[in-house]
């Protein structure tokens, strides 16, 4: 009988990555609740440039994810992760050395160019056995939620008492701690560097990493975050119309996120996740479709909106854990893993960017019901495509 318990090394790697992701995401998320207010006080600050300062991080992430993945396949994942964290550290220092909105934009752009998400997931999948990857990614997923909740609560307090730039000093310190954790606590993968790397490998590599099976995951994570962004730019408005004051929204988000993670852990650790693994993508897409239908039919009813949001979060979190863990199992050639996981991360950021831009465009000409109808149509296309692209 196979041992599905995590061994000491797997637990150490998982917890180390948890801390690294927690510290890094605290530095990223902490800016969001305060930038719109304090950015106006910077030299040259205006709403457009503040929006650019927010978006430039995601733009450089999109640009550098794949190059970092290719470099990790060639030179090693651990070295590239440390290099990316150092770039994030440099970006933080650039921000605190200026009092200009343009310095903030440049610093945020450099922070984003340390694009290590895909490389980190590739190294994690190198070091964790297949049967334990879902558990490991689930635990790390919690660190994302925790970092978001801590950031939303603490960032305004820190900025009010210690100043706007204190957030970036904290980000710089967290980057150094993260580098030390990666260097001392996370081992290198034995197979992560291709010893006989040749130039003629690229043609085979491109054909391999863009095959139908992988494309299903690339498209899946793109649409998942596309729908998430589309929803969260209109759901707060729907909650306000239902009578829920803005300063109470966090309670609904907190409750639904916590319950969705509880549901996820129940599946992963007690039901072993495998009893409906074969059709998991289609099942979750169906529940996303159901949640969007409930949003459309809610008529600003608070209970209906909350229930729809809960269904959406459950399906979202299951796919958010399933996609990277199962994708890593599909990669039969280890030295392509960094490139594939980086394309996956790029698809994720592209989904967020496209969701935000298209939502802004649609909101200019249509109401929220039309947007929900558009999302339902996209979800149906996704379901059909996923069904026919099954392995």
UniProtKB/Swiss-Prot annotation:
InterPro entries assigned to the protein according to its UniProt record, in alphabetical order: MFS (IPR011701), MFS_dom (IPR020846), MFS_trans_sf (IPR036259), MFS_Transporters (IPR050171)
Membrane topology label: Multi-pass membrane protein
Gene3D superfamilies found in the cross-reference section:
MFS general substrate transporter like domains (1.20.1250.20)
Transmembrane residue ranges: 15-35, 48-68, 81-101, 139-159, 167-187, 217-237, 251-271, 275-295, 303-323, 346-366, 369-389
Keyword Transmembrane belongs to the record? yes
Task: Write out the GO MF terms.
Answer: transmembrane transporter activity
Which keywords label this protein? Cell membrane, Membrane, Transmembrane, Transmembrane helix, Transport
- Going by the entry's taxonomy, the superkingdom of the source organism is recorded as Bacteria
Instruction: Give a GO cellular-component term.
Output: plasma membrane
Q: Where in the cell is it found?
A: Cell membrane
Family per similarity comment: Belongs to the major facilitator superfamily.
Q: Which PANTHER family match?
A: MULTIDRUG RESISTANCE PROTEIN MDTH, RESISTANCE PROTEIN MDTM, PUTATIVE-RELATED-RELATED
What is the protein's name according to its record? Answer: Uncharacterized transporter BUsg_450
UniProt source species? Buchnera aphidicola subsp. Schizaphis graminum (strain Sg)
